[in-house]
Amino acid sequence: MAQLVESVMGLNVELSPMSTTGDQQADWSLQEKGGKGLFTKELEVALLEGRADLAVHSAKDLPTENPDGLVLSAFPVREDPRDVLVLNEQVKDPQILASGSPRRRAQLQKRFPQVSWKELRGNVETRLRKIAVQREADGTILAAAGLSRLGIKEYPGLTFNKLPIDEMVPSPGQAAIAIQVRSNELDKFSVLDHEETSRAVLLER
């Protein structure tokens, strides 16, 4: 994203990585605590306090309403919105799948009615290892865009299968990046917007 801002706007970008509540509480169930806002609050506070000029969010993690003084200025080009079914390569008929998402569970239950569900917390690498090596579940479902951004196309002991959208409808805003800014700088950063992506994500939200 820094490269996009530099190339399109001609600005020098200083990155300010931040850890959010959702990042820090790896043992929380997002469904119990409420997933929306857990990955955004700290970034929004930095914007409002003037410690940052723009915040880069995963669009699917954003609440539908912005805090007073903040707006979404742009949605750059979207990546692949599909979900990926990741299975241990020795598994043909999974019995235990890992996902905390009610959306993913409900849709995949039609394909695998025999499956029981559990949650695997941790980053993507940790979850892949828990399936490939530790066999804590037969598989999981991950976002294709997230795997792509991490450069993960394969993993020893696992198979990756992208699910058609008519079989697994993605989360609203999945694979899209949202740029949030202070309200008085909306026009300044709107040049980063990709019209087709913006229109689709706003309709989904």
Regions found by a protein language model. Name each.
Residues 27-54:
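Short, structured active-site "lid" loops
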Residues 36-37, 76, 167-170:
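Short Gly/Pro-enriched turn/cap motifs at secondary-structure boundaries
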Residues 57-58, 98-100, 141-143, 180:
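Short beta-strand segments
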Residues 1-32, 105, 110-205:
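Small-molecule-sensing regulatory modules
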Residues 52-56, 138-139:
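Short, Asp-centered acidic motifs that coordinate Mg2+ and/or phosphate
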Residues 16-18, 57, 75, 100, ...:
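Conserved beta-strand termini and adjacent loop/short-helix elements that scaffold enzyme active sites
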Residues 59-62, 66-115, 166, 186:
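A conserved helix-loop-strand patch within extracytoplasmic ligand-binding domains
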